[in-house]
């Protein structure tokens, strides 16, 4: 069943390091092969909820590995029994 999870990571690093840390998280998400859309404020992923939550956890670890003393994240989950896709939400705008 497909679920959407949006993730915004806010690493506690010097301002000059924010983009490199966020880029490392996005590169990791891309490496997983899951369907995703990168936006200016968050990345939305599509897949199995358990798999997506593992990705969210790993994203926190990546931030710390890249020097963040703390990571605040905003996670949004859209879950319904029949599944939900990114395309059904925004496909008409593409």
Q: What residue ranges belong to the model's regions?
A:
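Charge-rich, low-complexity N-terminal segments
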Residues: 1-94
């Amino acid at each position: 069943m497909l679920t959407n999870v949006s993730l915004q990571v806010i690493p506690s690093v010097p301002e000059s390091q924010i983009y490199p840390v966020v880029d490392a998280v996005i590169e990791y998400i891309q490496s997983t092969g899951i369907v995703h859309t990168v936006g200016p404020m968050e990345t939305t992923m599509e897949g199995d909820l358990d798999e997506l939550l593992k990705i969210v956890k790993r994203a926190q670890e990546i931030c710390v590995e890249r020097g963040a003393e703390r990571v605040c994240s905003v996670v949004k989950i859209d879950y319904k029994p029949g599944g939900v896709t990114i395309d059904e939400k925004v496909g008409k705008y593409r």
